């Protein structure tokens, strides 16, 4: 058990200065003043702020990259890097390289991170179609593997499989059915590239098939102006979009253009590669994205419009669109995924471990 005394809570909403009792990895009680008749570990929160742990829904936990040959493969992420960024939940996935990287490797890494105290889930698939899987099918992965929350796919990208409208509908239908059977809120996380068709296939699939728009969740939606305009239209229709941050606050200008901000999440694309290409298609430049970008982006947004308005993009919104019932908020009965801040510095990360 732990007792945090006299701490300002943003849950994300402002709860004021409270005491928080943690028991069995859960938030047992939040009250103005908590006194116990027996001694337990007590943390003095005076002058500090308590928030939910951040959720990063786009992390290449086994390492991404590879577009510039084997030398460009990124290393797997370390658990301490995640915790140092104030992140207590991650979604691991594959990217361009679904050939030398595997879903089995992803699953094993997720188990490692979970055992070290970070909630870790994964997506099956990669950029390619048909999807590479852990079991014999996308459906079996979602139904039988608790940690698998959906499928990854690339669209409108020169590295994608350039699937057809019917293939997209077929894949989405399979995810939908498996999601219902598993009792999950499974989704199709769609890596969006720079090609001019942008979200065209997604719009066509939604129009043609009776599949909930919530199943389609495009990411990297600020990649270019045309894509972002289509992403805004997508949110107006009730869809969820994810914006990749760079740690320099660029997401702010995009968020300010969106009406339905509850359907917007921000992620890092950590341990994935960023790359630019020459006219002949060869790699011009490549680098690896650090997970610390998420914390930096949160601090930037928090300093612009406060904890209450900044936190949801990194916590509550993410939990809601992914179907997490007990994380993403500082609330009685929720998991004790918490971060203690003093100004812009993390003082302590508390997880289930």
Name every feature range the model reports, one short phrase each.
Residues 96-107, 116-211, 225:
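Buried, small/hydrophobic-residue-enriched core segments of structured protein domains
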Residues 1-37:
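N-terminal metal-binding scaffold of metallo-dependent hydrolase/deaminase domains
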Residues 53-57, 90-92, 120-124, 149-155, ...:
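Hydrophobic faces of well-ordered beta-strands that scaffold small-molecule active sites
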Residues 45-108:
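Metal-associated gating/positioning segment near the N- to mid-region
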Residues 7-9, 18, 24-27, 327-353:
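C-terminal cap of metal-dependent C-N hydrolases
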Residues 260-341:
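His/Asp/Glu-enriched, well-ordered alpha-helical/loop segment
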Residues 174-277, 283-284:
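Active-site core of metal-dependent hydrolases
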Residues 7, 25, 47, 58, ...:
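Divalent metal-coordination and catalytic microenvironments
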């Amino acid at each position: 058990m732990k007792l945090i005394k006299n701490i300002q809570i943003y849950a994300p909403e402002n709860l004021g200065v409270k005491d928080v009792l943690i028991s069995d990895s859960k938030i047992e009680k939040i009250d103005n003043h908590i006194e116990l008749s027996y001694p337990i570990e007590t943390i003095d929160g005076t002058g500090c702020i308590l928030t939910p742990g951040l959720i990063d829904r786009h992390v290449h936990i086994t390492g991404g990259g590879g577009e510039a040959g084997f030398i460009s493969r990124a290393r797997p992420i370390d658990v301490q890097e995640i915790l140092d960024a104030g992140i207590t939940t991650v979604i691991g996935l594959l990217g361009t390289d679904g050939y030398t990287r595997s879903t089995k490797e992803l699953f094993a890494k997720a188990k490692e991170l979970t055992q070290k105290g970070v909630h870790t889930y994964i997506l099956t698939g990669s950029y390619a179609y048909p999807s590479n899987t852990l079991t014999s099918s996308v459906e079996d992965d979602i139904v039988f593997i608790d940690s698998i929350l959906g499928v990854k796919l690339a669209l409108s990208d020169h590295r994608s499989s350039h699937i057809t409208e019917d293939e997209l509908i077929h894949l989405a239908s399979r995810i939908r059915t498996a999601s219902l059977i598993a009792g999950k809120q499974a989704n199709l996380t769609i890596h969006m590239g720079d090609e001019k068709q942008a979200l065209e296939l997604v719009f066509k699939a939604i129009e043609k098939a009776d599949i909930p728009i919530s199943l389609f969740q495009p990411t990297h939606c600020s990649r270019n102006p045309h894509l972002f305009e289509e992403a805004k239209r997508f949110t107006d229709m009730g869809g969820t979009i994810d914006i990749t941050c760079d740690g320099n606050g660029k997401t702010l200008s995009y968020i300010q253009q969106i009406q339905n901000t509850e359907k917007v999440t921000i992620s890092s694309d950590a341990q994935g590669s960023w790359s630019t290409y020459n006219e002949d298609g060869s790699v011009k430049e490549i680098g690896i994205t650090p997970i610390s970008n998420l914390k930096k982006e949160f601090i930037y947004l928090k300093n612009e419009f406060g904890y209450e308005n900044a936190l949801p993009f990194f916590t509550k919104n993410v939990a809601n669109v992914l179907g997490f019932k007990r994380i993403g908020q500082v609330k009685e009965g929720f998991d004790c995924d918490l971060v203690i801040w003093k100004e812009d510095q993390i003082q302590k990360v508390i997880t289930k471990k």
